[in-house]
C-alpha cells in the first residue's frame, strides 16, 4: 500500500513482505517542475498522465525492490513533455507572426504642421516689430546694416526658450505637436512612443537654421557690395559666385522635393528636419481635438452685416436727413426764443442789446458759407432768402435734396443766382 507520493518520487517501503534482507532503494532523479503552460494544456489530461506514471512506478517497484533501469519512463520521452514541446513551437510561430505584422504608421495632420510653422513666423514678426522700435532714433541705415544680426539675436532667444528647453516650439504647442527623435524610434513598441531629441540634434538644428541663415546673408551682402558677379569668368571670385548660385538653386530644388514628399507622407516639414530625423508627432495622442466655430460664425455674421450696409447706404440720402434734423432743431430753438422775447418785451433796454448782438453775429456769419464754412465765399451765389453760399455747396445741396432749406433762416430754397455788388 502506498502511503504518499511526493514530487521527489521517493519510493515507499513494502510493509507486506516478510523478507528480512535490507535493500537500499536509490530514488529516481527529481523531475523539474513543468513550465507555465497551464493556459495551453488541459488540466484533465495532466491529471491522467500523472496517474498513469504513478501506476507504472508502483508496478515496477512491486516486481523488484531495486531501482528500475529500463522499465522507468524517462523525462524526455514522457507524454506531457511532448505536448509541451509542440505547444511551445506553436507559441514561437505566433510570436514570429506578431513581430512580422506591419504596425500602423504614425499619421499626423499636415494642416496642423503647416499651421504651427505659420504661427512661429508670426511670433517672430511680432517680436521683431516690437524690437525695432528701440532703434527709432538711430541712424536710418543702422537697421539695414545690422538686420542679419538683429534676426540672429531674436531667433537665438526664441530657439533657446522653445526647442532647446522644451523640445518644441510655441506654435507646435498650440497645435499639440512636439519633436520626436525618429532615428531612435522603435516601431515594435508602438506609435505612442516618444523619444526626445538629443543635444546633438538640438545644436545642429540651431546652427543650420539660425547660424546658416545669418552666414548666407552676410556672404551674399559682401559679394554684392564688392561686385564679384562682374568679374571675368576665369576669375576665382566669379567662379565662387557661380558656385553659390548653383548651391542656392540646388537647395531650393531639394526643399521643393522635400515639401512634395511631405504632402505625400506627412513626415518632415523642412529639409533640415529630414536630415536630422526630427519629426513632428502628437504630444498627447489621446487628446481630443476640439474644433470651435465661434470665431467663424462671428466673422460670417459681421461680413453679412457689412454687405447689407454697403447695399443699403446708396439708397439713403444722408444730407436730406441732416437737413430735416437741422430744420427741426432750428424750429424748436426759434419757438423757444420767441417765447422768451414775449416774456422780456417789458424790458426795452435788454431787447435792444439782444438785437444789436444778433446783428453783429449775422454780419460775422455772412462772411462765411453756411454749408462749408469757407471764408471768403468761393463764387458767391444768393438764394431766395438773400443769404450767400458757395456755388458748389448750394448747387450740390439743391441737387441732392429738392426741399433744401437755408441753414440760416430755414426757408425753402427754390432758385439761386449769381451775387453781384449792384444787387
Swiss-Prot record:
It is a multi-pass membrane protein. It is found in: Peroxisome membrane. Zn(2+) 1 binds at residues 369, 372, 390, 393. Residues 1-46 are annotated as: Disordered. Keywords: Membrane, Metal-binding, Peroxisome, Peroxisome biogenesis, Protein transport, Transferase, Transmembrane, Transmembrane helix, Transport, Ubl conjugation pathway, Zinc, Zinc-finger. The chain crosses the membrane at residues 110-136, 143-168, 198-224, 235-265, 293-316. One of its GO terms (molecular function) is zinc ion binding. InterPro entries: PEX2/10, Pex_N, RING-HC_PEX2, Znf_C3HC4_RING-type, Znf_RING, Znf_RING/FYVE/PHD, Znf_RING_CS. Residues 137-142, 225-234, 317-423 are cytoplasmic. GO terms for biological process: peroxisome organization; protein import into peroxisome matrix; protein ubiquitination. Its EC number is 2.3.2.36. It comes from the Eukaryota. Coiled coil: none annotated. It catalyses: [E2 ubiquitin-conjugating enzyme]-S-ubiquitinyl-L-cysteine + [acceptor protein]-L-cysteine = [E2 ubiquitin-conjugating enzyme]-L-cysteine + [acceptor protein]-S-ubiquitinyl-L-cysteine. SMART domains: RING. The keyword Zinc-finger applies. Residues 27-37 have a biased composition (Pro residues). Belongs to the pex2/pex10/pex12 family. This is Peroxisome biogenesis factor 2.
Amino acid at each position: 500500500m502506498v502511503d504518499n507520493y511526493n514530487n521527489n518520487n521517493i519510493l515507499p517501503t513494502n510493509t507486506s513482505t516478510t523478507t528480512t534482507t535490507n535493500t537500499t532503494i536509490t530514488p529516481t532523479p527529481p523531475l523539474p517542475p513543468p513550465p507555465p503552460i497551464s493556459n495551453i494544456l488541459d488540466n484533465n489530461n495532466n491529471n491522467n498522465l500523472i496517474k498513469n506514471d504513478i501506476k507504472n512506478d508502483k508496478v515496477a517497484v512491486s516486481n523488484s525492490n531495486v531501482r528500475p533501469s529500463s522499465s522507468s519512463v524517462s523525462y524526455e520521452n514522457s507524454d506531457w513533455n511532448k505536448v509541451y514541446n509542440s505547444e511551445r513551437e506553436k507559441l514561437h510561430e505566433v510570436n514570429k507572426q506578431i513581430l512580422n505584422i506591419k504596425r500602423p504608421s504614425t499619421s499626423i495632420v499636415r494642416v496642423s504642421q503647416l499651421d504651427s510653422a505659420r504661427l512661429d513666423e508670426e511670433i517672430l514678426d511680432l517680436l521683431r516689430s516690437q524690437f525695432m522700435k528701440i532703434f527709432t532714433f538711430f541712424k536710418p541705415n543702422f537697421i539695414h546694416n545690422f538686420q542679419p544680426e538683429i534676426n540672429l539675436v531674436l531667433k537665438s532667444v526664441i530657439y533657446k526658450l522653445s526647442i532647446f528647453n522644451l523640445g518644441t516650439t510655441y506654435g507646435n504647442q498650440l497645435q499639440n505637436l512636439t519633436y520626436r527623435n525618429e532615428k531612435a524610434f522603435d516601431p515594435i513598441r508602438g506609435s505612442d512612443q516618444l523619444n526626445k531629441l538629443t543635444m546633438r540634434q538640438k545644436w545642429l538644428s540651431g546652427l543650420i537654421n539660425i547660424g546658416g541663415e545669418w552666414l548666407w546673408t552676410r556672404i551674399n551682402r559682401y559679394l554684392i557690395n564688392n561686385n564679384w558677379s562682374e568679374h571675368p569668368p576665369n576669375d576665382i571670385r566669379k567662379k565662387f559666385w557661380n558656385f553659390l548660385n548653383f548651391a542656392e538653386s540646388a537647395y531650393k530644388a531639394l526643399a521643393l522635393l522635400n515639401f512634395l514628399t511631405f504632402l505625400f507622407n506627412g513626415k518632415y516639414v523642412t529639409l533640415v528636419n529630414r536630415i536630422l530625423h526630427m519629426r513632428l508627432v502628437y504630444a498627447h495622442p489621446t487628446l481630443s481635438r476640439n474644433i470651435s466655430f465661434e470665431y467663424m460664425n462671428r466673422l460670417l455674421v459681421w461680413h453679412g452685416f457689412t454687405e447689407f450696409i454697403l447695399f443699403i447706404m446708396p439708397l439713403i440720402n444722408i444730407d436730406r436727413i441732416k437737413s430735416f434734423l437741422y430744420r427741426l432743431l432750428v424750429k424748436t430753438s426759434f419757438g423757444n426764443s420767441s417765447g422768451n422775447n414775449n416774456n422780456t418785451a417789458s424790458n426795452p433796454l435788454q431787447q435792444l442789446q439782444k438785437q444789436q448782438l444778433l446783428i453783429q453775429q449775422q454780419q460775422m456769419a455772412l462772411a462765411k458759407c453756411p454749408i462749408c464754412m469757407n471764408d471768403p465765399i468761393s463764387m458767391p451765389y444768393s438764394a431766395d432768402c438773400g443769404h450767400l453760399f458757395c456755388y458748389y455747396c448750394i448747387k450740390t445741396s439743391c441737387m441732392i435734396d429738392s426741399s433744401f432749406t437755408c441753414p440760416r433762416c430755414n426757408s425753402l430754397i427754390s432758385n439761386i443766382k449769381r451775387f453781384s455788388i449792384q444787387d
